């Protein structure tokens, strides 16, 4: 079954991604992955690094002649900024007798703790006096690896007409509580929504764009950051019964929520109407069954496509809430890890708003969980075998 591992630091030579368990004979090109990597880098309010890095994946194994071969897929992403960090991020020991080398190391040493980051707990956990080693791995640069792995999961899901996408629904409180889509979108309506969303740099419905953009501009001028919310949707031919009710760790809502919560800055996740269900009566939040020309159908999708820990055939809907980035031009109060002296927190290059990019990363994690559960249900070592088990003759 699909699993993945990533390695690499934010300012190191690059990122390495290994994806295991993908069936043989899945069509896969670098462009399939680069497309999502580019979507991750889009976003009004992104910082300077997006002008430095243009991510292009390189396959190192597991793919031959444009198709997977059943072995682990190895990929790398280059960090173009590494040329400016070769000494402080050197893998090999450096000459500490060289004054210039010592100066470069000292310039990149961080002891001033940044509130809201992994700095303090990481330094304590690993016994470090320099937070650089924590910052490098906890950086959101790592999410490029997840997007690469998720793009492969999406490609597998597409063979079964399952599609995963996201759109920004709120930034800095603007858009909260509004609905920009039909209550029960058709496949074509979902497709049209996401085509329109990907045409702007906030990855939101056009009706929200100007208001969200103005909010980001306001924050950039004020030197502060903004969070927001994204809706995640898996739509198409969603199989009934992904996940299970039999154990806590097999319930797909828990798996999906956990995957989304693992994304940097995500602080809350809702399934379906989420917290709104707590304010309604039982009769108001259930999705009633109807007979639609002999087919079982529903009058609503308040459950977000999940009942009893299993998919029920409707679109799977989640909403992820992302906090404002903790790194700001307006420094926060902190202390020095070593001296305990008060300081203004260290400023590392950052974004004003990373919510659009966060949606793409959450998509990747959602796709990985759905692909894992699809494999668990269907089995098979090749795409053809999986398709046969699903009763399909072709993708």
UniProtKB/Swiss-Prot annotation:
Cofactor info, note text: Reduced FMN (FMNH(2)).
Record flagged with keyword NADP: yes
UniProt: NADP(+) binding residues: 40, 46
Cofactor(s) listed: FMNH2
InterPro entries: Chorismate_synth (IPR000453), Chorismate_synth_AroC_sf (IPR035904), Chorismate_synthase_CS (IPR020541)
Keywords assigned by UniProt, alphabetized: Amino-acid biosynthesis, Aromatic amino acid biosynthesis, FAD, Flavoprotein, FMN, Lyase, NADP
Biological role: This reaction introduces a second double bond into the aromatic ring system.
Subunit structure: Homotetramer.
Name of the molecule in the record: Chorismate synthase
Organism: Gloeobacter violaceus (strain ATCC 29082 / PCC 7421)
